[in-house]
């Protein structure tokens, strides 16, 4: 099954996450199909906290991809803010 979930990057104590479309059997930070955005939980000032390529995200959702709980919440928050 294809899932849309967060993949961790960044350094120690400074997390940064990519929203990735991946096979659910792969590891968290392993091989992915496509990156569709990012989430920066420690963004300050003018830094961008969340970016989602909504066109690609909608494509994958139409193909049957399942979002993780956290990604679903981020998408909902992004839609409310826009």
UniProtKB/Swiss-Prot annotation:
Pfam short name (any one): Ribosomal_S16
UniProt superkingdom: Bacteria
Gene Ontology BP terms: translation
Task: Output the Gene Ontology terms for molecular function.
Answer: structural constituent of ribosome
Task: Write out the GO cellular component annotations.
Answer: cytoplasm; small ribosomal subunit
Q: Which family does it belong to?
A: Belongs to the bacterial ribosomal protein bS16 family.
Q: What is this protein called?
A: Small ribosomal subunit protein bS16
Q: Which organism is it from?
A: Saccharophagus degradans (strain 2-40 / ATCC 43961 / DSM 17024)
Q: Which gene encodes it?
A: rpsP
